């Protein structure tokens, strides 16, 4: 059935990410797997444009793809713009998905993307803080959300707030259901 195919594709998309991110050491192998995740995500976003989950897991793969390929390749491919567009769409479709996952992705892309005049002029740490704070306040705050927020507020000079957030991260009990 199409529901079964959709579930299998989503599971495969997640599996590509976890395999490349946590099971592989070789950069070339990681690139191959993230390429598969990127392609599968694009295919299923086209098939299911109103799916927050396909967009989210596409962005997870795309963000990791950008890390293994490097900042210049990612900039040439327009990764930051893609991440911004799809994050905004996730927020529009389901702001609660993955405990504010759309807000998290939008905040993370503002935080991690370099400001490049004439090419990438929208990344902004104030916007990163705004969206990362929204992600922490939506649903159950996740460790990764707090970690990114701590980095963004630290960059902004809010060192005490960053320290407080990082202490919360350190003292978080592991979630065995994740």
Regions found by a protein language model. Give the residues of each.
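An amphipathic alpha-helical core segment
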Residues: 133-140, 146-156
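Helix-start (N-cap) detector for alpha-helical repeat units in TPR-like alpha-solenoids
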Residues: 6-7, 52-53, 98-100, 142-144
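N-terminal alpha-helical scaffold/docking segments in eukaryotic complex subunits
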Residues: 1, 7-8
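Short coil/linker segments at helix-helix boundaries
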Residues: 2, 12-50, 56-89, 101-135, ...
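Alpha-helix initiation/capping motif
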Residues: 70, 94, 124, 141-142
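Accessory, usually C-terminal, subdomains that scaffold auxiliary metal cofactors
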Residues: 141-143, 147-150, 162-166, 170-173
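Ligand-binding pocket scaffold of soluble enzyme catalytic domains
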Residues: 93-96, 100, 144-145, 149-152, ...
């Amino acid at each position: 059935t199409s529901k079964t195919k959709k579930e299998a594709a989503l599971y495969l998309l997640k599996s590509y990410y976890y395999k490349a991110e946590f099971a592989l050491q070789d950069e070339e192998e990681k690139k191959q797997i993230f390429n598969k995740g990127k392609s599968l995500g694009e295919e299923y976003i086209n098939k299911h444009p109103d799916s927050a989950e396909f967009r989210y897991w596409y962005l997870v793969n795309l963000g990791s793809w950008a890390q293994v390929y490097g900042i210049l390749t990612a900039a040439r491919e327009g990764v930051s713009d893609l991440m911004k567009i799809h994050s905004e769409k996730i927020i529009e479709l389901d702001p609660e998905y993955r405990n504010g996952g759309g807000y998290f992705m939008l905040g993370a892309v503002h935080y991690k993307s370099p400001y490049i005049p004439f090419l990438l002029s929208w990344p902004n740490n104030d916007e990163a803080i705004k969206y990362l704070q929204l992600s922490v306040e939506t649903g159950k705050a996740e460790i990764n959300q707090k970690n990114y927020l701590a980095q963004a507020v630290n960059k902004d000079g809010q060192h005490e707030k960053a320290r407080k957030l990082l202490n919360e991260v350190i003292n978080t009990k592991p979630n065995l259901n994740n």
